[in-house]
Regions:
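FIC/Doc superfamily catalytic core
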Residues: 1-6, 33
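Nucleic-acid-binding surface
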Residues: 4-8, 19-24, 39, 54-202
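Basic, Lys/Arg-rich alpha-helical nucleic-acid-recognition elements, primarily the DNA-binding modules
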Residues: 7-16, 44
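Polyanion-binding surface elements
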Residues: 13-30
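Glycine-rich phosphate/ribose-binding loops and adjacent secondary-structure elements
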Residues: 28, 51-53
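Short amphipathic alpha-helical interaction segments
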Residues: 28-40
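A short, conserved structural fragment
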Residues: 42-49
């Protein structure tokens, strides 16, 4: 490719400093063919359909890049279950698979460069206890700790055993837990007896 294209990529990197969509790349004068070639050459990292990370020695991806990238693909998706417990600080080990929640009616494709476990929620359950994390790369949604612990029990078969045990152990010691809120959510999700058997109030 001609040097003028590489100069343009450097200009784009300086301007956007990270994530950029196909639409903006084309607004900056790149063609689909050039975008494909730049991706093959390692100048662009395709994080999902229509979304890229500009590779530059001057900056690197944020630690929470998985959450940021999911939100760029589907801004209404919510980090849930074990992953939410990590982002909310209950556990310090990041699950390898990112757990995300979407509405049952959500038809967004969530094909990412990393593995995700997608869970579908009813309208009412989807809206409960959402927190918004604002970053310079955009915002993303995360469920609160009490409901996320409950979701871990609900989706136990989809969660790494060691991560699940860490969530339960840490929640038992968590001094800000709201058992009333957790049990209300558990009963609404029809897993009240499962939660009681585990004994989160020890």
């Amino acid at each position: 490719m001609r040097q003028i294209i590489y100069d343009k990529v450097k200009y784009i990197a300086d301007k956007y400093k990270g994530y950029i969509d196909t639409e903006d790349l084309m607004k900056e004068g790149l063609t689909n063919r050039q975008i494909g070639l730049l991706t093959a050459e390692g100048k662009l990292d395709k994080v999902a359909h229509g979304h890229y990370w500009i590779i530059s020695p001057e900056f690197s991806k944020p630690e929470d890049y998985k959450a940021v990238e999911v939100a760029r693909v589907n801004r209404k998706a919510v980090i849930c279950a074990d992953s939410a417990c990590y982002y909310m600080g209950l556990i310090d080990k990041e699950p390898e698979i990112l757990s995300i929640a979407t509405r049952r009616s959500d038809r967004h494709k969530m094909k990412m460069n990393f593995e995700v476990s997608r869970h579908y929620f009813s309208e009412q359950a989807f809206e409960d206890e959402k927190h918004v994390f604002d970053t310079k790369y955009g915002s993303y949604n995360v469920y609160g700790i009490d409901r996320s612990v409950c979701d871990c029990i609900r989706f136990r078969e989809d969660i790494d055993k060691d991560i699940f045990e860490l969530v339960i152990e840490n929640y038992r010691k968590y001094d800000k837990k709201n058992e009333e809120r957790l049990m209300a959510y558990a009963k609404a999700m029809r897993i009240g007896r499962q939660v009681e058997r585990i004994g989160l109030d020890r």
